[in-house]
Amino acid sequence: MAEKRVIMIGGGLAGLAGTMKLAELGVHVDLVSMVPVKRSHSVCAQGGINSVNDTTRALGDSEWLHFDDTVYGGAFLNHQPPVKEMADWGPKVIDLLDRLGVPFNRTQEGHLDRRRFGGTLYKRTAFAGATTGQQLLYALDEQVRRWESEDLVRKFEFWEFLGTITDDQGVCRGAVVQDMFSMEIRALPGDAVVMATGGCGLIFGKSTMSMICTGGANSRVYQEGAKYGNGEFLQVHPTAVPGADKLRLMSESARGEGGRVWVPRTPHDSRDPSSIPEGERYYFLEERYPTYGNLVPRDIATREIFDVCVNQGLSVETERLCVYLDLTHLPATTHKKLDGILNIYQKFQGVNPRQVPMKIFPAIHYSMGGIWVDYTKDETTGGLEHGAPNNHMTNIPGLYAIGEAEYHYHGANRLGANSLLSTIFEGLITGPSIVNYINSLKSSAADAPAALFDGAVRKHKDAMDELVGRTGDENAYKLHDELGRTMTENVTVVRYNDKIKETLTKIDEIAERFKRAPLADNGQWTNQNLSFTRALGDMIVLAKVIALGALQRDESRGAHYKPDFQIEGLDPDSGEDMTEQARRWCKQFQANNDKWLKSTIAEHTPEGPKLTYEDVDMSLISPRPRTYGLKGAEEIMKVWNSEFAKKPVETKKPVAVSA
């Protein structure tokens, strides 16, 4: 058999970690990226990376509690064995990064400094100022460049993924890519292809994601037969800065370091915020969620900000919706830790956030859903069976997916600082699985007939020629703006079925109009118009997966919030016995789980997405009510434990701890 070769699509943290691991195992890797790998979207990650550590362990923390926080925060929609494995690997991943030279912040004693992020009561988050993603990316790229110098890695930067190559047995044998300078289209034979292509924020027009995060690559493999899981679950980050071009993230680290979210109790109060007395400030997260305060899970913080601005009419400004994120009370030493994000705000808003509270509003930020992938559970540890060939393999043999591109780890809502852990962990753990898969093959991609690769290239050249020669009266950029506005208005923070139906109708309309959208540039050199227009067609396909999944899921779970199907808390003023109310609530919660605690699986058909539902692996932790700020939570948990739970869970009120 010829030398082993893997095609890695994407040069962010997942792609670099996977490339590094595969090269260590002696596998040749072709690393394909639309941008220089150091400009992958992972570079924008700010806040930190989670793991249990010695200090939190002394306070009662453990990998099991990290695992529990993750599935609880994800509303139990996460498959549990992969999540447990990730939590178990957390300390090892951070130790590896430390040894690779990542400049993590340290305490005066020289230990790694930690901050607390949302959805947990422990300071698990290691960080490098407010530019953690950049530091991790640079460290991993340094390792990849070492393997590049030893001819185990070839980088294809400024190359775009167009599609996979599958043989007559449906086995993935490589990828078709395009040089974004010369516009050359070529085939890259590979014994496996790994999608490490990130999220799909551009479907919503403006988001905190980079402009390359169209979801186009994921949509292409979906259209080629890969299943897509939980597409309707997208995270709307509570704190972003509105901009004319895009939305800029203000990291959760700002709240983790003591930042406070508030609005004046007087609507649209025009006074200098520093002159507004404490008694006239509404710290709504702290009042509603005294245990977690400003660090409730992101889906909850986002809905509260939306409610305060839209339903309560307490937006700071009248022309745009926003609340204050206030760091002015923090000392200069804390501001220094956050320089990375504070400088971004000052650069784009012209205001020094060290002296004046920031104005922020929620924005699309992360894709919990993604390409469906498989795994094998280790029955002894409850985690993953190391080296199992199907770990992170899609339903197409030889095609893998890792990082934000896949759907496993974060369920209905991702906890802050779990993303950097999951991306790197996935790259590392999938490497041996890919090697074992390749070793099981009877022949390599290099042995496949040339006609297989020539035919794949011809197909994509024909598609490009059709696009270049297209005529019509539509404009791709205007269509993208319409798509983004519709998706943002109707399929983000609050979702109503009538509005989602309107969105699906609009998507179909845009899809028809797209066929009449010619290129503004027919050039054969660095044609960005071609790349964008092609991606728009793929965004339209994926938008329908998202919207249809949202329409059919008649419940509220994590980031998917439908007020018409929300199970409200108890009413102590109703006169009805609280225990009886709690019992009815628990019955409704259990019935809802019986119906909807399942992953949405989309399969592409010419008529549109075909949706089915997959049971979630809950073999390690039984689901329980997600009671952040829920009225009557203590009574609900008391009844749940005594009458409904398969395994009793702790009901005492948690106390925030500091490490």
What does each of the following model-derived ranges do?
Residues 1-5, 18-21, 25, 36-38, ...:
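Glycine- and aromatic-enriched mobile tails/lids
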Residues 192-248, 317, 410-433:
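Glycine-rich loop(s) and the adjacent beta-strand/alpha-helix scaffold that form part
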Residues 27-33, 230:
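Short beta-strand "acidic-cap" motif of Rossmann-like dinucleotide-binding folds
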Residues 35-69, 235, 246-249:
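Conserved N-terminal glycine-rich FAD pyrophosphate-binding loop of Rossmann-like flavoproteins
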Residues 93, 98-184, 196, 205, ...:
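Conserved redox-cofactor binding core of oxidoreductases
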Residues 10-13:
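Glycine-rich Rossmann-fold phosphate-binding loop(s) that bind the pyrophosphate
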Residues 220, 226-359, 433:
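An anion/pyrophosphate-binding glycine-rich loop and adjacent beta-alpha core
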Residues 2-4, 183-192, 395:
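Core beta-strand elements of the Rossmann-like FAD/NAD(P) dinucleotide-binding domain
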